[in-house]
Structures are given as structure tokens and as C-alpha cells.
Swiss-Prot record:
Gene Ontology terms: biological process: division septum assembly; FtsZ-dependent cytokinesis; regulation of cell division
Name the UniProt record assigns to this protein: Cell division protein ZapC
Major location (coarse): cytoplasm
SUBUNIT field: Interacts directly with FtsZ. Monomer in solution.
GO cellular component: cell division site; cytoplasm
Disruption phenotype: Mutants divide almost normally under standard growth conditions.
Function: Contributes to the efficiency of the cell division process by stabilizing the polymeric form of the cell division protein FtsZ. Acts by promoting interactions between FtsZ protofilaments and suppressing the GTPase activity of FtsZ.
UniProt-listed HAMAP family: ZapC (MF_00906)
Keywords for the protein's UniProt record, in alphabetical order: Cell cycle, Cell division, Cytoplasm, Septation
Pfam families per UniProt: ZapC_C (PF07126), ZapC_N (PF21083)
Signal peptide per UniProt: none
Record-stated family: Belongs to the ZapC family.
InterPro entries for this protein: ZapC, ZapC_C, ZapC_N
């Protein structure tokens, strides 16, 4: 099922589930990854889904097409990205878990990025939600990963210094002629 932004969509905080929610107005609800302690005060006043939200939705949806995720996972990632941009409290970078490359890439919101874990050198796929001069707020763009003994799931937020981030290259986009 494909979801499409609608001016009947509504943001609200659900006390029972301790999560930011989005009422999709067709009997469907989206429960974000973000609990009360992670949200700004704006999150606790119900709000409509505005034109800016819809524009960001379509931008993130387009950028997420290349991720190796199911349609449902991509939709979940996009909606969590909207919650993060609109309602997430500022975070401190947690870059010590990742390999530094010594060069600075300044990603743009919606960019597919990757980092490598310092301890295992495992690649981790990310969606850049907000970008600054030195660090970027990212969401995990894969089903799960364990970072320093803590399990992260699709859509979890982490801020990372730009010298750890690399643009993600979509292997499927290369042709045989380019490889030879």
C-alpha cells in the first residue's frame, strides 16, 4: 500500500505509547521511534500536516528509493525523518563509534550516507535528515545494527561528525561498461 500526504493528516503525542504519532486520516496511524524525552515542547500540541511536511515527505521518499528496504520500511524511514526534522531535540554527536576518514563531506538532507563501525568495520547505512557544517543528524537506514552493545533499529536517530560520513554508492546503478 502506498501512502500519500493529505491535509487531513495530524501530528500528536500519544501518552499511552510514549511516542510521537501521525494520524494518516484513513484509519491508519504511524507510531514514530521517538519517545517524550527526545521531543521538543512543540510535539505535545496537536498539529496539522502542513505543506512543508508534504514537500519534505516527497523529497525524502524520492531519496529513499535506492535503499535496499521494503516499501513499508522506506515509508517508515521517511515518516521518522519528518518527525526528526520537526520535533526531535538537538543531539550531541556520537562519532567515536565510527571510523574517521580525515576528509570532510558535507551531506545534504535526504542524502544516503554510510559509516564504518570502529570495532568491526561493518558498514552502516544512514539517511541524512539535517546537515550542519561539522555534523549531520542521521537515521538508521537498515533494519538493525549493534553499536557498542546497543541495538539500533530502522529509523533510530544518531548525530555523526561529517568526517565519518561517506556518500553511499548504489552498486546496482553501475553498468558492466562502467566496470570495464
Amino acid at each position: 500500500m502506498r501512502i500519500k500526504p493529505d491535509d487531513n493528516w495530524r501530528w500528536y503525542y500519544d501518552e499511552e505509547h510514549d511516542r510521537m504519532m501521525l494520524d494518516l486520516a484513513n484509519g491508519m496511524l504511524f507510531r514514530s521511534r521517538f519517545a517524550r524525552k527526545m521531543l521538543t515542547p512543540d510535539a505535545f500540541s496537536p498539529a496539522g500536516f502542513c505543506v512543508d511536511d508534504a514537500a519534505l515527505y516527497f523529497s525524502f521518499e524520492e531519496k529513499c528509493r535506492d535503499f535496499n528496504l521494503s516499501k513499508e520500511q522506506k515509508a517508515e524511514l521517511v515518516l521518522n525523518a519528518l518527525v526528526a526534522i520537526r520535533y526531535l531535540k538537538p543531539q550531541m554527536p556520537k562519532s567515536w563509534h565510527f571510523v574517521s576518514h580525515g576528509e570532510m563531506w558535507v551531506p545534504m538532507p535526504g542524502d544516503a550516507a554510510c559509516v564504518w563501525l570502529s570495532d568491526t568495520h561493518e558498514q552502516v547505512n544512514l539517511l541524512v535528515v539535517e546537515s550542519g557544517e561539522n555534523a549531520a543528524l542521521c537515521l538508521l537506514a537498515q533494519p538493525c545494527v549493534v553499536i557498542a552493545g546497543r541495538a539500533m533499529q530502522l529509523g533510530d536517530a544518531i548525530k555523526i561528525m561529517n568526517d565519518r560520513l561517506k556518500p553511499q554508492v548504489n552498486v546496482d546503478s553501475f553498468s558492466l561498461e562502467q566496470a570495464v
